[in-house]
Each structure stands twice: as C-alpha cells, then as structure tokens.
A protein has these predicted regions:
Chain A
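Generic anion/oxyanion-binding catalytic loop in active/binding sites
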Residues: 25, 86, 181
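Short amphipathic alpha-helical segments that mediate assembly, nucleic-acid/protein binding
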Residues: 18-21
C-alpha cells in the first residue's frame, strides 16, 4: 500500500488585530460585523466602539450581538449605552435592550431607580421587568415605592406582576392602597387580588 | 352563554397575571385557551396546533409581538391566516402602525376589560356574539 502523504495543514486564518476588529465592526459585511461585535469586548476601547456601532447598526442579528457584547461587559457604563434603546419605536430593539439589561442585573440595578421614575410610562413599565431579575428584597422595595407614587395603571400592573413573585406580607399594604386608587380598572383589581392571594399563601 | 367550545385561542403574553386574566375571560365564554410566554414560544405552538385566534402582546422577552406577526404572516396557509389581535400598553400611533404593517387584524390598548376581550375574540373567531 503506497504511503499517502498527509496534506499540509491549511494556514490558519490570522486572527484580526485590534484595528481590524474596530474597522470590521463599522465597515465589514454583516457576518464580519457580527463576528467583530463578539470580539470587541477584548479591546480597551470597546465601549466607545460598541456605542458607535450600535447607533449605526440596522441588521437585527448584528445589533443583538452588540447588545450581548455590552451585557457581557456588565458595567454601569455599558448599561447606560443600552438604556436609550428602551425608548425605541422598534419593538425588536426594545426587546433586545431589555433582554441585555436583564442579563446584567448588577449593572442595570444602578440605573433602575432612575428608570422607575422616568417621565415615559413605557420606560417605567419596562423597568419593572428589569427589577424582576434583582434579588427579591431589592425588587420588592423598589416596586412598592413605585406603586405608591404611580399614576399609570399599566405601570402598576407591571409592578404587581413582579411583586406577585417577590412580594412579602409588607407588600400587602401597598397593594391594598393601589386597589383603592384605581377602582375603575378591573384588570388591576384582578391582578391585585391574585398577587395578594399568592403572597398570602407563601 | 354562547358556545365557543370549539374555538381555540392562543394567548401570547409574558405577564402571568395578564394570561390568567384573559384565560378567565375567554374560558368563561367557552373558548379553549392555550398560553405562550413570548413570540418564540407562540410560534412553536402555532406550528404544532391549530388556532382560531392569537392574542399577542407587543413587548415580550426573546421575541416581541411585532416580530412574531411578521414571522407568522410569512408562513404557509393556514398558519399565516390566523387572525391576530395585538394588545399592548404602547398606545402611540407608531406602534399601532407597526402592528398593522406586520399583519395585525386589530389592536387593543391595555388595560382591557374582560368583556371587551371576549367580544373581539368572538368576532375574530367568526362566532356570533
């Protein structure tokens, strides 16, 4: 049997250097930008690069890779880059931003008190979803404070949804006051009763 | 009570209390209700089971309601033809327009009364009120 010469190993694709990653992130093809987004976190200037890339990116899967990279960085600063996208008119962008913030609870928590007081009710509502990933005591305290001052029934409902899971006997008073404030909202009455039953049964 | 016992409704909403509220309203009128926690789970369900109506929230983790709608409408019939009632707290014109462009049959702004929900479910299921 003749000896078969083993083919030479193909040359390894050289890893892109830092400058290449930065260029790829902004100017590359969809696949290159996606790859670069995943590698950018290794660079010292990752945050400004990802911030710029996110503001320009129009392809959903690349945008998601950028959100994931920012979540992976897990800093208060990287959370701050994501937060404005909670206000997007595009539901997919809001979802991607929310998912990213929920993946970095420690960093998101720094911004949460401000988000729960945001002038935009839709932002306050999404902030309730971020609170869900905090330790139960922290989430309950923040959401009880929110419910005490909140005038929008949908935001109250979002907070009650989380409190039904995290709340304690201390939450019952706030829930009772909320029911009194919105007597004309049947969904809130239903949500409050269900939450109180669940908390009471624990 | 009208008989909607053969009408199957899929409720897609990440809020457990909302799903329970809708279920209570619809089951009281005889609808059969299935639930999904987000658009992705909703898609899995519509691919496996037949539904007369989907009631879909907009803001949900993993897959939002608008993306769900775009994907649903890109499927083959009869899946692509399932009537979809979008429910959301997003009351801006932009969101309503996005839902309409994505193929929503109607858009209801939360909070929604149980009677209203059941009434629209009956209309879209082709059942007499």
């Amino acid at each position: 049997m003749p000896l078969i010469r083993k083919p030479a190993s193909p040359p390894e694709t050289p890893a892109p250097d830092d400058r290449n990653i930065a260029e790829m992130l902004i100017e590359g093809s969809d696949d290159e930008r996606w790859t670069a987004a995943r590698r950018t976190t290794l660079l010292p200037e990752a945050l400004p690069l990802l911030t710029t890339a996110l503001s320009k990116e129009r392809i959903a899967r690349v945008r998601e890779a950028i959100f994931t990279a920012l979540a992976k960085m897990g800093s208060s600063e990287s959370a701050a880059v994501i937060i404005p996208y909670l206000r997007s008119d595009d539901a997919a962008q809001r979802t991607a931003a929310l998912d990213a913030l929920r993946a970095m609870p420690g960093a998101a928590a720094v911004h949460l008190p401000g988000l729960l007081k945001d002038a935009d009710a839709d932002v306050r509502l999404l902030a309730c979803e971020i609170a869900r990933v905090l330790p139960a005591d922290d989430a309950s305290r923040l959401l009880e404070e929110l419910i005490e001052r909140e005038l929008n029934p949908n935001v109250c409902a979002a907070a009650i949804e989380v409190l039904a899971e995290t709340g304690t006997a201390a939450s019952l008073k706030v829930l009772g006051q909320c029911a009194t404030r919105f007597p004309e909202e049947p969904f809130l009455a239903f949500a409050i009763k269900t939450a109180r039953d669940r908390i009471g049964s624990r | 009570m009208s008989d909607y016992s053969k009408k199957r409704v899929l409720v897609i909403d990440d809020a457990a209390l909302v799903r329970t509220y809708y279920r209570s309203a619809l089951e009281a009128r005889g609808f059969v209700v299935e639930e999904a926690l987000n658009g992705l789970e909703g898609l899995e369900k519509v691919l496996l089971q037949a539904f007369d109506l989907a009631i879909v929230d907009v803001n949900m983790p993993q897959m939002d309601g608008i993306t769900f709608l775009h994907t649903l409408r890109s499927k083959e019939l009869p899946i692509s033809g399932i009537p979809v009632l979008v429910t959301s707290t997003e009351s801006g014109m932009q969101d309503m327009a996005a839902a309409r462009r994505a193929g929503a049959n109607y858009y209801l702004v939360k909070p929604i009364k149980q009677e209203t929900l059941a009434e629209y479910a009956a209309i879209f299921c082709g059942a007499a009120r």
